[in-house]
Amino acid sequence: SDYIKRPFDMEVVHRRVLNTIKLYAKQRRLVAMVTNQVFEKEKNSRMLISVLSEIVEFRNGESGMHVLNINILTTMILEQLVKKTDKYPLSWSNRMLISTASSLHDIGKIGIDEKILNKPGRLTPEERKIMEKHTVIGADMLANLQMYEDEPLMKVAYQICRWHHERYD
């Protein structure tokens, strides 16, 4: 109990104060440990997504900046969307989730023939149709990861991957 009855025994008061200080210090250490673990988990997730994105870009012959640019643009668009309208009340963590998931938008390109993927110049209509399948290929790849199907990142990444070339105009 937190109450000490009168008359006060100074030894009991002293022990209670020390125990309270120790508990507070332990709680702070635990909070710091959990915070560090969450940070490490987030860092590792972003690192793995960056590695996958780099693999796709390397195979595609892109500079390595495409995914970073998409990530930055997604973040900027989401911030403006939240500022301009109440229609999409996205929290900071939701915006970061969407931004992270956007890094996987072109993962389906790994399933496209290199001759088409790295062709200099314009694609033929047939090649264009094949290239357009990268959205379906990527979405299927993500959908096949059934053990992660309920994860928010996977759900958002699937939607972005599948529909990022659709035009709503």
Listing of model-derived features with the role each one plays in the protein:
Residues 43-169:
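Histidine- and acidic-residue-rich, metal-dependent catalytic cores
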Residues 32-47:
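Short, charged amphipathic alpha-helical "coupling" segments at sensory-output junctions
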Residues 7, 20, 24, 110, ...:
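Residues at alpha-helix boundaries and the short loops/turns that link adjacent helices
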Residues 18-36:
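The C-terminal output helix
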